[in-house]
Amino acid sequence: MVLRNSKKEDPFFGMFKTYAATIDRMGSDFGKIISDYHNVERAIADMKMTESECDDLSHVLLEELNNSFITPFDREDIFMITNQLDDIADYIEDTASKLQIYGVESIKDDAKEMGQLIDDATSDVSRLFYVLPEQKKNKNAMENIIEINRLENLGDAVFRRALGKLFREEKDPIEIIRWKDIFENLEDTLDACEHLADTVRGVIVKNA
C-alpha cells in the first residue's frame, strides 16, 4: 500500500489531523496547568472532556478502518497510530488528574520542565500529520520525528535528575510516592509521543 498523493485528501489523513490537533491542544493546556498551578480545577475538568473527544475520534477512525476497502497505507499501521494517539491523550489526562487526586499544592521545577517538553512534543505531533499526506514533504515529516525524539531524550534526562533529587532531598515517604508516580506519568507521555513518531517513520520508510 502506498501513500496517496492526490488533490483530494484521504479521509484518514483528515481524521489524523483532527486527532493530532486535539492532542496538541491538550498538550498546550497541560503546559499551562503545570506552569501556572492556580485554580486549575476547571482546566483539569475541561481536559477530561477533551480526552473524551479523543476517545470518540478513536472510535470513528477504527470504524472507518473497518469499513474501508482501500486505505492510504497498511491497515495495521493505521490501527497502531490510532491507538498511539489515544495513549498520548490518556497519559496527559491521567497526569493532570493525578495532580488533583494527590492534592498537589505546588509544582516542582523539573515537572514544569517536563510539562513544557510535552507541550512542544504534542505540537510536533500535530505538525507531523499536516505534512504526512504529501510525499514531497517527507523531509519535513522526518524533521518533526527527529525533533520529537530529541524532546523525549531531554525528558529522559530531566526524569532521571528529578528522581535522583526526589530520593536525595525528600524526607516524607508519601511525598516521594506521590511525585515518583507523577514523574513516571510525565515520562510515559513523552515516550508515547516518541513511539508514535517511530511508527510514522516506519510508514514513511515502507512507502518511500
Name these PLM-found stretches.
Residues 1-208:
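Cytosolic, long alpha-helical scaffolding segments
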